[in-house]
Amino acid sequence: MAFYESIYILRADLTTEQVELVNKRFSDNVAATGGKVVRTELWGRRQLAYLVKKNVKGFYVFHILEGEGSMVHDLEAKLGIDEDVLKFQHVRIEDVSDKASPLAPCEEKGEEGKAEDAADELTTFGMADDDDLGDDDDTVEAGI
């Protein structure tokens, strides 16, 4: 059996009970196809990068699944016709990490190292840190 990361975005106007109902349907579909939900993370309501089905926000849900390729095919068919689901994506992964994903809420990550993790992520992605702000010493003037 293979492992898969599954993420889907739900309409932001859904209540907590409706989100739980969609997650229950998703888990039932996984179990019906012989798969297993290894981990679930609710990332919450977030701003979308662009309009998706006339929505500017969505509720992100992340799962790690174990199952066969046919399971993913069945899930895509069912998520594609679900009116509450805006977008979805499944990716096959080699191994499962015990660490929570970077977008997981802080409660799921644990108390230790939250600030350090956030700072590491910013520097990893080339974001400016305090000593870079306002420095113009490394700019090159274009002699026009």
Swiss-Prot record:
Annotated InterPro entries: Ribosomal_bS6 (IPR000529), Ribosomal_bS6_sf (IPR035980), Ribosomal_S6_plastid/chlpt (IPR020814), Transl_elong_EF1B/ribsomal_bS6 (IPR014717)
Key word RNA-binding present: yes
Region of interest (Disordered), residue spans: 99-144
Biased composition (Basic and acidic residues): 106-117
Keywords on record: Ribonucleoprotein, Ribosomal protein, RNA-binding, rRNA-binding
Recorded GO MF terms: small ribosomal subunit rRNA binding; structural constituent of ribosome
Listed GO CC annotations: cytoplasm; ribonucleoprotein complex; ribosome
UniProt keyword RNA-binding present: yes
One GO biological process term: translation
Pfam families per UniProt: Ribosomal_S6
Biased composition (Acidic residues): 128-144
Function: Binds together with bS18 to 16S ribosomal RNA.
Family that this chain belongs to: Belongs to the bacterial ribosomal protein bS6 family.
This protein's name: Small ribosomal subunit protein bS6
Organism: Magnetococcus marinus (strain ATCC BAA-1437 / JCM 17883 / MC-1)
Gene: rpsF
